[in-house]
Amino acid sequence: MVLRGTTNPWGLDWNDVGEMFFTGNVNGHLWHGIPGARYPRMHGQGFSFHVYDRIGLTADHLHHEGEWTDRRKFRDNAEGLTNELGGGHSHAGGMIYLGDNWPDEYRNTIFMSNTHGRRINNDILERQGSGYVGRHGRDFLISNQPWYKGVTQIYGPDGGVFMSDWPDLGECHDNDGSYRSSGRM
């Protein structure tokens, strides 16, 4: 085990100097992975009773307004201020672009799928003290397809990027809208 804590860390990548970053859900979307570190969990502090403090969110922003549970009010997509802030609290995948096929502005920035907002968020990683801060970049992709739930991004040897999605109307807070009869993946 490299580190402990967080909630649903579904994306992981390294920048060009070997620093680990991962994406998560509920209690923040971007974390700097430090070996041996302890991070906040969704419920409780875990079993590390002698830890002075946990390492906080790397991002200086959230992709939603209010509490993460407010997402349950929305059915098809992020609305209002949450839409403007980046789409919601659920993120999957995490790709730090190190290729040379895209414009230089994307190099060493992290891309992550926002499953509620039907988009790919982009955060700009900047050095701050002994760590990093993630600043909100412009959303890279916004889908108008209600079935779109991005999962991963990865770049190939030529610098081109491949993305996968989970085409389904349901997601993690929807128990009756999941479309299970098509077998689509």
Per-region residue spans from a language model:
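Beta-propeller domains with acidic blade repeats across secreted/periplasmic ectodomains
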Residues: 1-185
